[in-house]
Structure formats: structure tokens, C-alpha cells
């Protein structure tokens, strides 16, 4: 993975672009996730997606921390040790909440990614109701943001695949008799 020099962004802060060895954006796939955020579209500027790929995410956090320590003079204006850099870094997954916040629109306010249903047909993002559906998301790491006393990763939502949520409306367990007949005694 390579990182660029810090550049001023439109918000007045600084951003570092992140590229992999082939000079392509790093793409990260999330496992199936559910959100309680409501409707995707104009009413919501971002969604929260849960991930079960915590090992891969923690590895990416370590790579980012390594780069931050190595480039601390350029990124922060002075050389810093790993402990100091780690205190400033906002990890991808918060310990309290295993979620990643991903904006769904770009600067123009429109979503340019693809939204697909279970049949792989393109659908309108305004028709997605997160309270009744599950989805897979493909997100892309697009840079590192810096604000006073903190830095973290910036993400872009590339695609969403919507799945109907399966609700259990009837008894879902096997018969108790079947379960106990195969069990071994303690």
C-alpha cells in the first residue's frame, strides 16, 4: 500500500490518498449487514454497516498505523512514536460498536454507486428500506482524513445488494425429541 503527501481538501482539512501496490484504490468487502438507519436516500447522508471481518479490518488498522508512524513528520509536522499516533487514530471499528460509517452521496448529493436486488437487477437507492431489508455492501478506502487531534479513514460506498430480511413466523427448532436422541451424555 502507498500513501500520498497530505493535500488540503474542500473542508479546510488535509487528506492523504491511499493506493495499493498496483496503483488502484483498495476495495474492502463487508459481510452481510443490517442497519436500523431507515431509508437510504436524501433523508440520510450516511449508513452504518456492520462487519464480521474484524481480523481483516484490524490488519488494515495496523497497516495504517505503521504508515502513520513512518510518515509522522510529513503528516503531523513532527516525528511521533506509535503510542502517540495510536491515541490520535480513530480505528475503523469502534470497540463499542462494530460498525463503519460510510457516506452514501458525493459532493453533489447524489449516489453514483450501484444498488441491486436479490435478482441482480439495478434498483433505485430511494426504494431501499433498511428497516425491512438486509444488504451486502462493497466499500472503498479513498483516503485518510486529519482533524486536530484525530485522524482516520475515509470510505466511499460503491455498491449495495439488497436482500429481503427473513423473518421467522413459525417454530424454527427441530423437535426436542430429535435433538436429545443424538446427544451424548456428559
Give residue spans per PLM region.
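Short coil/turn segments at secondary-structure boundaries
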Residues: 31, 150-153, 169-172
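Short non-domain terminal segments
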Residues: 26, 114, 169-171
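Extended serine/threonine-enriched, polar tracts that run as long, contiguous segments within proteins
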Residues: 90-165
Amino acid at each position: 500500500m502507498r500513501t500520498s503527501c497530505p493535500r488540503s481538501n474542500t473542508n479546510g482539512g488535509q487528506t492523504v490518498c491511499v493506493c495499493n501496490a498496483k496503483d488502484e484504490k483498495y476495495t474492502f468487502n463487508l459481510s452481510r449487514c443490517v442497519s436500523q438507519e431507515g431509508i437510504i436516500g436524501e433523508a440520510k447522508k450516511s449508513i452504518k454497516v456492520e462487519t464480521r471481518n474484524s481480523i481483516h479490518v484490524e490488519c488494515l488498522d495496523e497497516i495504517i498505523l505503521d504508515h502513520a508512524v513512518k510518515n509522522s513528520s510529513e503528516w503531523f509536522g513532527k516525528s511521533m512514536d506509535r503510542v502517540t499516533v495510536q491515541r490520535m487514530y480513530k480505528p475503523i471499528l469502534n470497540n463499542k460498536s462494530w460498525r463503519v460509517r460510510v457516506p452514501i452521496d458525493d459532493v453533489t448529493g447524489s449516489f453514483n454507486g450501484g444498488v441491486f436486488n436479490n435478482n441482480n437487477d439495478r434498483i433505485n437507492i430511494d426504494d431501499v428500506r433498511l428497516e425491512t431489508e438486509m444488504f451486502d455492501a462493497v466499500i472503498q478506502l479513498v483516503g485518510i482524513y486529519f482533524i486536530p487531534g484525530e485522524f482516520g479513514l475515509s470510505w466511499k460506498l460503491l455498491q449495495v445488494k439488497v436482500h429481503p430480511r427473513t423473518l421467522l413466523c413459525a417454530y424454527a427448532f427441530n423437535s426436542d425429541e430429535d435433538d436429545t436422541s443424538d446427544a451424548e451424555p456428559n
